[in-house]
Amino acid sequence: MSDSVTPGAYGVVERGAASTDAARIAEHIRIAGYAVVPGAVSSADVADLGLRLDRVMARQVEEFGGAERLASIGDALTARCPLVYDEAFVALAAHATVLAICRELLGDYVVLMQQNGVINPSGQRHTQVAYHRDLPYQHFVSSRPLAISALFCIDPFSSETGATRMIPGSHRTEQFPSESVAAELDTAVSAAPGSFIVFDSMVFHRAGENRSGRPRRAVNHVFSVPIIAQQISLPDALNGRYADDPALARLFGYDVTPARSVTAWRERRLARQDR
């Protein structure tokens, strides 16, 4: 049998075929673990989302009784579920390009497991500067992704502002690498405002040190297959909002919340048949 020759390679008999931008980005993520999607949101909308995130954070500080109480549980720099507070973050979570990439990697049934605003202040240590997976404490790998993270950049991600740092390919290894190997592989991912950094949630990553003199803000989304429970129940937090929108109801997990009773489970199944 003769060797098959393809452009830029030889001895290759199988090759990936990425016919769309989403498929190409998904292939990159399968191999490297991450990819940058630039220019996903306009500059005007990015600025608006930054103001809205600041307001959500201020409201959550007030709701919980002050910044000191939040700091006592290590949560003073995280605005949780901003989509519950502001519809602009609903649109961000349902970004068509990001969902297309997620469906390439996870299949058609994609659920938003969590959405968190992340604030990396200048000159302060954020909990996210430690290496972690977005599915923490898990030391196994799967043949296909279980969850995909999409980190939306409100401010520039650079060496000065503390760009997210990845260990490429670590979504395919069970253990965290040795200290020396982690340092060798550690890669800063720069991105402009309005970009998404999309990555396999099992990639080990961390926030960089912000030395810019101003906060570096982002909104992280974790999309998953429906067998993984949400961090915070979005159907409960939303109090039924968007339940009548089939696409958003599925995305926000309305169809996969545990049934409250046997009868409720059967009624839900019957309702699905009637759709």
Regions found by a protein language model. Name each.
Residues 2, 173-198, 202-203, 208-275:
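Conserved double-stranded beta-helix
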Residues 2-32, 38-131, 136-138:
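Non-heme Fe(II)-dependent double-stranded beta-helix
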Residues 42, 90-94, 143, 183, ...:
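Aromatic-acidic/polar surface patches that form glycan- and anion
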Residues 42-43, 118-120, 157-159, 171-172, ...:
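Short, solvent-exposed loop/turn segments at secondary-structure junctions
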Residues 111, 144-146, 213-215:
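A short, structural micro-pattern
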Residues 115-117, 150-152, 219-223:
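A structural signal for short, well-ordered beta-strand segments
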Residues 126-190, 228-238:
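Catalytic core of non-heme Fe(II) oxygenases with the double-stranded beta-helix
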